[in-house]
Curated annotation (Swiss-Prot):
Residues 134-147, 292-301 have a biased composition (Basic and acidic residues). Signal peptide: none annotated. The modification Phosphoserine is found at residues 101, 129, 134, 256, 269, 278, 344. The keyword Isomerase does not apply. It comes from the Eukaryota. Residues 94-107, 272-285 have a biased composition (Pro residues). It comes from Homo sapiens (Human). Belongs to the smoothelin family. This is Smoothelin-like protein 2. Keywords: Coiled coil, Phosphoprotein. PROSITE patterns: CH (PS50021). The lineage of its organism: Eukaryota, Metazoa, Chordata, Craniata, Vertebrata. Residues 55-88 form a coiled coil.
Amino acid sequence: MEPAPDAQEARTVREALGRYEAALEGAVRALHEDMRGLQRGVERRVAEAMRLAGPLARTVADLQRDNQRLQAQLERLTRQVEALGLASGMSPVPGTPGTPSPPPAPGVPDRAPRLGSARFASHATFSLSGRGQSLDHDEASESEMRKTSNSCIMENGHQPGAGPGDGPPEIAQNFSAPDPPRPRPVSLSLRLPHQPVTAITRVSDRFSGETSAAALSPMSAATLGGLNPSPSEVITPWTPSPSEKNSSFTWSVPSSGYGAVTASKHSNSPPLVTPPQSPVSPQPPAITQVHRQGERRRELVRSQTLPRTSEAQARKALFEKWEQETAAGKGKGEARARLKRSQSFGVASASSIKQILLEWCRSKTLGYQHVDLQNFSSSWSDGMAFCALVHSFFPDAFDYNSLSPTQRQKNFELAFTMAENLANCERLIEVEDMMVMGRKPDPMCVFTYVQSLYNHLRRFE
């Protein structure tokens, strides 16, 4: 008897389901194996990461403990310092938290603005009447300025006062207290416009005591300063004794002019020695004053021409006149005193002044195209250096990048006009003169105008 078709079909279905179930179980087992393998890999990597992070965690914990220990020690030291300060009666240290800074004493003047203004004045011009032409003169002597309140500062023709600190060390030691201030005659540098250094004249550096005394009289000093001597400044003549003729004197001419002459004697004699007066000229005062004014006017006109060499020639002629006048009335056997240049005029060499001014121009034109300052002649021939110097102080006045070295006349006209309008710097050089001089203009003309630019542009720094 054969089975029914329904029973056979049901058995076939059950066999198919069994095979399908076995396949599913195999797939699930394979999936479980893969999951266990992945879990083992993750656990292995986590363990490796934990092993690597373990020393770092221990190091961080050690650092935290050290930080806490140091903070505790710092607090303990702070309390000890405060206890010591209270025990010794000292006030708390200014600047600590909770401690206000003490206000400045009302009786102590603030010297910072004056020092700053004096330092600015020292950088303003290169003046022959100054004590030095170095740009760093005031920075080097700032400590001396704070210690000596009556030191004589002569920068750019400005002289705030006079004191014993301005003379040599031998004279300064004999002053126990500063003299009361009294009005001083205005020096020639204040009465006349600024005249830049153009040349340095070598002169004899040895003068005898009597020679200098006869030449540098109060009347001649006042004449050089452009003023008549006041009755309060009349000084009694001094006649050296035979024992003093062989003594060594050091004459110092202050920077305010050729007026006041002092001397220091290397012995126990009085510190200040006044040379005798020269005989007063019988010329009437009115005629003398008119003659002096005419000479000053001619000197002013001569100083405004280019190149400026009148000052050096005038100084050389002055010394030659002194030597001629004193050689006629004095013997050759008298002792001669050494005139120290550092104490007489304080004039640096012309090359050093030019180098300082050239370095200043380089610092202001650094980074500008077509500008390579090597001298005061060819480096300024195309006008680009003048434009760069003015543009460094007034960057909004014109577009420097639009200029070209080939347009020389345009560059000169632009630089000179902007300097005159913005910095009030007069034209000491004309555009036509620069065009005529070509690629190698006169160094003295260029130096004179650049120095004038320096004097006016420094005010805008």
